[in-house]
Amino acid sequence: MDDLRLLRHFEAVYRLLSFSAAADELGLTHSALTKSIKQIEHGWDVQLFHRTTRTVVATEAGKKLYPMAVELLGFAKNVRTSVQSGEHILNIVSGPAILENMIPLAIEKFARRFPNTRINVETMPPHLAVEELVQRRIHLVLYHEATLRGVAHFNRLRVRNVCDEPYWMLFRQGHPVRQAGDSLEDILGFDWAIAGFDDLFENNLSDDVQALLQAHDFPKYRLLSQAACIDLARCSDIVTAIPKTAACPLIERGEIDGLPHPGGFNFSVSAAVLYDAGVEPTVEHFVDCL
């Protein structure tokens, strides 16, 4: 516990680049914080900071320690929360379309086997989500396979594909897109709203497709809600795209019109955990439920 306390002190100094600001944040005196940093330096025989009367600059050893310290502190916080609550917590981050299409049914299946596990699911940009995973503040990320291939820590991830199905276009009844051609260029002349379309996904498309999308400023609207995109498509001239299994029931009920997407894009979802995180039964079973 003492090592965690010292690492917490180091993390604050590194992040704030100020002993005074870190001491204020931690509720310590300047001398007590200085003593903590010296204790690490003497115990490990390293120098963590270059200090003058006005500046604090991390050494190479300090720069190397910081990401590992953040990761360890995040893991310790999760352990403490789990032990204190007496129940297991599963923290997940996904793309918005995945959250709306796959998570509810997965939770319903998962709860049959692990009824006492709490689940927190949120959405955020994929590069931030993977950073949270690396720092062990979450257990699992779920994104389009092409998106995951573009993240900085991809080589640290154990990735498993869990879904692969075609996209369908959705649009209001009587929309002129139904009379448009069947090429990607033909349909890009309309305004589009897409849930969670990100740069990492786009960057993994072929050069000619990227050029075509950029030439049409696709998409015009990016929303963090698939439901909002569907509502826009239902009541305006905006077109959206969602997975086939979500689109077909809406079309069959007459709520909206739709066609297979001519671009050849698939809703290809992958689950990712850290390679060195070990096998957590609840995480593995949640992925099985997707």
Segments and roles (model prediction):
Residues 154-193:
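Flexible hinge/capping segments at coil-to-helix
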Residues 257-290:
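A late-sequence structural motif
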Residues 11-29:
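Short helix-boundary/capping micro-motifs
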Residues 15, 41-58:
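A short LG(V/I)-centered, amphipathic sequence patch enriched
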Residues 125-126, 134-137, 144, 198-257:
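Hydrophobic hinge/microswitch elements
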Residues 144, 178-184, 188-214, 280, ...:
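Secondary-structure junction motif
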Residues 87-150:
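Central regulatory/effector-binding core of bacterial HTH transcription factors
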